[in-house]
Amino acid sequence: MERAAKKEAVESLNGLFQTTSVAVVAHYSGLTVAQMQKLRSQMKQAGASVKVSKNRLAKIALEGTDVVAIGSLLKGPTVIATSSDPVAAPKVAVEFAKANEKFVILGGSMGKTVLNVDGVKALASLPSLDELRGKLVGLLVAPATKIAQLTTAPAAKVARVVQAYASKSEAA
């Protein structure tokens, strides 16, 4: 790799690390091309990305970013999964690691917090941002529907009483 290409790669990686909120580092030695493509497509569907780069260049690119702590994990054939959603990359990485034993999660970083393997798995078990938003909307809408039911219930009861009284007087 030429010096200019290395500089461009470092700048590209640094831009990626500046905008990410979570990074997961894993070994990928022994995975086939098809498995790597599957990992990339799963990450893309989840809104995350996967990068394979020289560890030395990645360490340089990490300087000055929030996820600088993952530099110590960059040894051997590593892949870095990043996402702006704190749950997307860890969730896909953990699911992929369960299906492919050659994909070994080393750890990661969420902001300036370093995560070990258990931390990445714990982060992956959390609901996604969209799921949390859905639950929040459900909680906000539930009281409104209850109020609507309570306000219409007395009117419905009065209508049934009047209907029963009317049918009783017709029968008499």
Swiss-Prot record:
Gene3D superfamilies: 3.30.70.1730, 6.10.250.290. Pfam families: Ribosomal_L10. One of its GO terms (biological process) is translation. It comes from the Bacteria. GO terms for cellular component: large ribosomal subunit. Keywords: Ribonucleoprotein, Ribosomal protein, RNA-binding, rRNA-binding. InterPro entries: Ribosomal_uL10 (IPR001790), Ribosomal_uL10-like_sf (IPR043141), Ribosomal_uL10_bac (IPR022973), Ribosomal_uL10_bac_type (IPR047865), Ribosomal_uL10_CS_bac (IPR002363). GO terms for molecular function: large ribosomal subunit rRNA binding; structural constituent of ribosome. The keyword Hydrolase does not apply. Part of the ribosomal stalk of the 50S ribosomal subunit. The N-terminus interacts with L11 and the large rRNA to form the base of the stalk. The C-terminus forms an elongated spine to which L12 dimers bind in a sequential fashion forming a multimeric L10(L12)X complex. Belongs to the universal ribosomal protein uL10 family. Forms part of the ribosomal stalk, playing a central role in the interaction of the ribosome with GTP-bound translation factors. This is Large ribosomal subunit protein uL10. The lineage of its organism: Bacteria, Pseudomonadati, Pseudomonadota, Alphaproteobacteria, Hyphomicrobiales.
